[in-house]
Amino acid sequence: MGGLIIEDLQEGFGKEAVKGKEITVHYTGWLENGTKFDSSLDRRQPLTITLGVGQVIKGWDEGFGGMKEGGKRKLTIPSEMGYGAHGAGGVIPPHATLIFEVELLKVYE
């Protein structure tokens, strides 16, 4: 079992996402078997969160850190930094590794 794996797909050149900042993101999430379980792109509705305060799974709080506006990353998130032994909403099974492609749209001052 490894930790969080961050792969930069596209370098961003805008403001940097740091703990405590509000950010707006697009994301798509898959299980390891390729099953897509959620996508803000499919809804055409980005998500705004405050980074590093526990609003989202730990893999996101850490995975967006240091990213710059316009950047895209692939995050491979181990279960303990995702939804753990409980899974989520009948869609994410217990102990699931999650794979997200994320795009940082905006960092707010």
Curated annotation (Swiss-Prot):
GO molecular function terms attached to this record: peptidyl-prolyl cis-trans isomerase activity
User: Mind telling me which InterPro entries this protein's record contains?
Assistant: PPIase_dom_sf, PPIase_FKBP_dom
Q: Which GO terms describe its biological process?
A: protein folding
Q: What is the effect of changing residue 33 to D?
A: In strain: BNCV / Serogroup B
What does its activity-regulation comment describe? Answer: Inhibited by FK506.
Q: Pfam families recorded for this chain? A: FKBP_C (PF00254)
- Gene3D superfamilies the UniProt entry points to: 3.10.50.40
Q: Which reaction does it catalyse?
A: [protein]-peptidylproline (omega=180) = [protein]-peptidylproline (omega=0)
Signal sequence bounds? none
Taxonomic superkingdom: Bacteria
SUPFAM superfamilies cross-referenced by the UniProt entry: FKBP-like
Query: Keywords in UniProt for this one?
Result: Isomerase, Rotamase
According to its UniProt record, the EC number is: 5.2.1.8
Record's function text: PPIases accelerate the folding of proteins.
Q: What family is reported?
A: Belongs to the FKBP-type PPIase family.
- What this protein is called in its record is FK506-binding protein
Q: Which organism is it from?
A: Neisseria meningitidis serogroup B (strain ATCC BAA-335 / MC58)
